[in-house]
A protein has these predicted regions:
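Basic/aromatic recognition patch in beta-strand/loop cores that engages polyanionic ligands
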Residues: 76-104
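Aromatic-residue detector
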Residues: 67, 85-88, 117, 121
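Enriched for short, Lys/Arg-rich terminal
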Residues: 96-125
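Compact soluble domain cores
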Residues: 1-82
Length: 125
């Protein structure tokens, strides 16, 4: 099995602030998290888990005080996208996945999730 490469600390995006993390936590706890297209596809067909398991994995990530980062724009500017968070979340004991959360009004979030891109460095937990 190939060893994972992680993004180097100086290249990481800023960490999410407590209010953003609480927003994501409340949305998962209150079942106000909605799955984006990639998360729907991966939970149903690839990982074969119920969406509540994905929410539970996010809650476990938060409870363990693992890191959640802001998301950089794709243009290489290192500008962060407002209300977009990302994390390397453990879905199962031996499966870490990429999760993006978009914070919406009324404690709602949109979750996008997929396997890590092969050959690309991952966010650390």
């Amino acid at each position: 099995m190939q060893k994972c490469q992680y993004i180097l600390e100086p290249d990481l995006p800023p960490l999410a602030v407590e209010s953003q993390i609480k927003h994501a936590q409340r949305a998962c706890e209150l079942d106000k998290a909605r799955l984006g297209q990639s998360a729907k596809s991966y939970t149903a067909h690839r990982w074969r888990v119920h969406e509540s398991q994905l929410r539970g994995a996010i809650l476990s990530h938060i409870a363990a005080a693992r890191r959640i980062f802001l998301k950089f724009a794709q243009d290489g500017s290192r500008r962060t996208i407002p209300d977009h968070l990302q994390a390397n979340v453990s879905l199962f004991e031996d499966l870490d996945i990429y999760v993006e959360m978009v914070l919406m009004q009324n404690e709602i979030i949109i979750i996008n999730a997929h396997d890590h891109t092969p050959g690309m460095p991952r966010l650390p937990q």
